[in-house]
Regions:
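Serine-esterase "nucleophile elbow" of acetyl-processing enzymes
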Residues: 36-84, 94-102
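N-terminal secretory signal peptides that target proteins for export/translocation
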Residues: 1-18
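Alpha-helical cap/lid subdomain in secreted, periplasmic
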Residues: 64, 71-74, 90-177
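Short intrinsically disordered, low-complexity coil segments enriched in acidic
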Residues: 1-3, 33, 176-177
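Acidic-and-aromatic substrate-binding clefts and catalytic sites of carbohydrate-active enzymes
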Residues: 85-89
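Bacterial N-terminal signal peptides
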Residues: 16-33
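Residues at the start of alpha-helices and the adjacent loop-to-helix junctions
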Residues: 27-29, 42-44, 83, 127, ...
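Residue-level micro-sites within transmembrane alpha helices that shape
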Residues: 22, 46, 112-113
């Protein structure tokens, strides 16, 4: 199968974050819905994992993803719209000016800082829903990176948070990792 080979290639990139590997594996699938014959712009909207906090610029997720996609034959520019410490509320506040007319697809990797801060899952859901709606209004394919809550906030919080990503992916017809 091609997928294990893709995952092995992603692991060799040296960026050991689960979401980065899954994003890279799914990004080519995300771009498959867009005409690959012309230059494409893919925006990665996220937090420090997207931004590349603490890494040399060339070693971050976005430059590694762009290099990987280009090696696979995609004429793509991946725009780093990651902000260290960002929450879903921050992503929601930035989404309209992030999705410029030249954007062809979007990766959304937000929610980790919401978890760290114990933000109500209903607020995180509403923010992610607004981000996906903004992308949908522009007809953009989206890859939503799912997160799972640890159990330290209790079972009700965990259940509410864990349901956000699959529910919103189904509602908006997005790809989900």
């Amino acid at each position: 199968s091609v997928m294990p080979a893709i995952l092995r290639s992603c692991l060799r990139l040296g960026y050991g974050v689960r979401s980065a590997v899954l994003n890279a594996a799914a990004a080519f699938g995300l771009l498959a819905g867009v005409a690959l014959a012309e230059p494409l712009t893919l925006v990665a909207l996220g937090d420090s994992l997207t931004q590349g906090y603490g890494l040399p610029q060339a070693d971050g997720f976005v430059p590694q993803l762009e290099a990987w996609l280009r090696a696979k034959g995609a004429d793509v520019t991946v725009v780093n719209a990651g902000v260290s410490g960002d929450t879903t509320a921050g992503g929601r506040a930035r989404v309209d000016w992030t999705l410029t007319p030249d954007v062809d697809a979007l990766i959304v990797n937000l929610g980790g800082n919401d978890l760290l801060r114990g933000i109500d899952p209903a607020a995180s859901r509403a923010n992610l829903d607004a981000i996906l709606t903004a992308a949908g209004d522009r007809g953009l394919p989206v890859l939503l990176v799912a997160l799972r809550a640890p159990g330290n906030y209790g079972p009700a919080f965990k259940a509410a948070f864990d349901a956000i990503y699959p529910d919103l992916a189904a509602k908006h017809g997005t790809l989900l990792t």
